[in-house]
Each structure stands twice: as structure tokens, then as C-alpha cells.
Regions:
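Non-heme Fe(II) oxygenase catalytic core, chiefly the N-lobe of the double-stranded beta-helix
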Residues: 1-258
Length: 261
């Protein structure tokens, strides 16, 4: 899904000036190369990283959200279903010092080696729910925004990486004027269950993509209920928070030759 020719989100980033400084391998357009500095790799001769000091040199590694941590699922969430898996291979590990990331404001920071990738488990989030919350989540669908990354391009990430900072939407919500969501007419807009079930093990997991979220569709009695965007974001943030505690996440310290699926 990283193809800069076919993926609308990757194309959009390039059109905005490719601030991420990421490039695809000419012979394998679905493979995107991330990093910092000059490279000559499988026919790709470029300077990676653009203006960002993210790869091992700052607290963030995201173009979106001003360089803050962003928990996410790889995928466009528009026009195409998410992939079955994400695959990352380390050619050359970043150099530099690691840092403590105080993402929850609880005095329990994440230790992030230079250029590390953090993983959170939707299964842990689901298992941490109460019985009533699980029942509610199992009856919940997530409606995603049309062209979600373009729509939210200017919004910063929240400190905990589980939502976005959207002052206008927050003000409407706080004023009691938030309208419920409504299904989109765009045929490429995506709707998925909030809870995904592994077909092999039957284990269940919360699997939202917070940045792309438009609203939640829930069930109240026999009726379907559509929540507003801020109410939906707050619910997802609350449900996912237990999965991003420092002792629950996995931080991968990249070494040359590592392959992570």
C-alpha cells in the first residue's frame, strides 16, 4: 500500500512536497524506503528524510501531527481494505541516542532507542475492557473519512498518539452542538467493525485507525446510533489507552538485517 503511484495518500504526500523524504524503489514500487541521508539502494539514489530530524534525532517519527507519536494501522482506509500484514526490514540502523517519550503524562514514559518503532496490541486493549464495554464494542462499526489523511493533514496528534487535536470539532462538542455522523455517499469510503477476530485463534482485538475515523455506529436496543466525531474519538481513545501503557507496548530497537512482520 506504500506505492507512491497508486496509493492516493502516498501520492498526496508527494504532491505536498514530500516532506517525509521517502521514496519507492524503482523496480519495486510497493516498497518505500525510510531514513535519513544519502543512499544508493537498488537503483534509488536520493537524500532521504527531507527536512525531518525524526529518524533517531527527535521525539517523533511522523510527518502528520507535528512529529508526535501516532498509533496507527498501515493502510489508506479509503478505496482499499487494510493489508493482511505490515513488513519492515532494516538495512542500516539509525545512530544517535535514544530518548524517553512521556506520551501519557503519567510519569511512566516509553524508552525509545534511536529510530525505534513502537507496537501496541489491540488484543490487549480488548482484553482490558469490562464485559459491558466488550459487548458495546462488538456491536460497533467504524466509519472512516473519505480521503482521510488529506482531510486531517493539518491536525496535530494528541500527546498519547491515540487521537488528533481538532479545536474546532472539540468546541462544537463542548458546546453541545455536535451533530451525529451520517454514512458517506462516497463509494470508496470505508466501514469496518471496531473489533476484528483472528480467523485462526478466535482471539479478538480493537482495531481502529484513530486519525482516519469519522464516527462510530453503535447499537442501542434494537436501533442503530450514530455518534459525532469528537464523541467517537474520545471513546476510541479511552478504550485503546490500556494498550499503550509503557509496560504493554513493544519497542523494536532496529539492527541491520532485522525483519519485522
Amino acid at each position: 500500500w506504500r506505492d507512491q503511484r497508486e496509493n492516493p495518500w502516498e501520492r498526496y504526500k508527494v504532491e505536498q512536497g514530500n516532506k517525509a523524504g521517502t521514496y519507492q524503489i524503482p523496480s519495486e514500487p510497493g516498497v518505500l524506503v525510510l531514513g535519513k541521508g544519502e543512499i544508493d539502494h537498488y537503483g534509488l539514489k536520493v537524500t532521504l528524510g527531507g527536512d525531518r530530524a525524526a529518524y533517531g534525532k527527535s521525539a517523533g517519527s511522523q510527518v502528520l501531527g507535528g512529529g508526535a507519536l501516532q498509533w496507527h494501522i498501515d493502510g489508506t482506509f479509503y478505496g482499499h481494505a487494510p493489508g493482511h500484514y505490515t513488513q519492515m526490514r532494516c538495512i542500516e540502523p539509525p545512530t544517535g541516542k535514544g530518548h524517553w517519550l512521556e506520551h501519557l503524562g503519567l510519569g511512566d514514559p516509553l524508552w525509545c532507542p534511536a529510530g525505534a518503532t513502537a507496537f501496541a496490541s489491540g488484543r490487549i486493549a480488548y482484553d482490558a475492557l469490562t464485559g459491558a464495554e466488550r459487548e458495546a464494542c462488538l456491536d460497533t462499526k467504524v466509519h472512516y473519512l473519505p480521503k482521510p489523511f488529506e482531510t486531517t493533514y493539518s491536525l496535530a496528534n494528541s500527546q498519547n498518539g491515540l487521537s488528533v487535536v481538532d479545536p474546532d470539532a472539540e468546541a462544537i462538542y463542548e458546546g453541545g452542538n455536535e451533530a451525529p455522523g451520517a454514512p458517506f455517499a462516497d463509494p470508496a469510503a470505508q466501514v469496518y467493525p471496531l473489533v476484528w477476530t483472528c480467523p485462526d485463534t478466535g482471539r479478538q482485538a480493537l482495531m481502529p485507525q484513530p486519525r482516519c475515523l469519522a464516527f462510530l455506529e453503535t447499537k442501542k436496543g434494537a436501533k442503530r446510533q450514530f455518534l459525532g466525531i469528537t464523541a467517537s474519538r474520545r471513546l476510541v481513545e479511552n478504550w485503546m489507552r490500556p494498550a499503550v501503557f509503557a509496560d504493554q507496548g513493544y519497542i523494536h530497537d532496529w539492527q541491520a538485517g532485522d525483519l519485522v512482520l
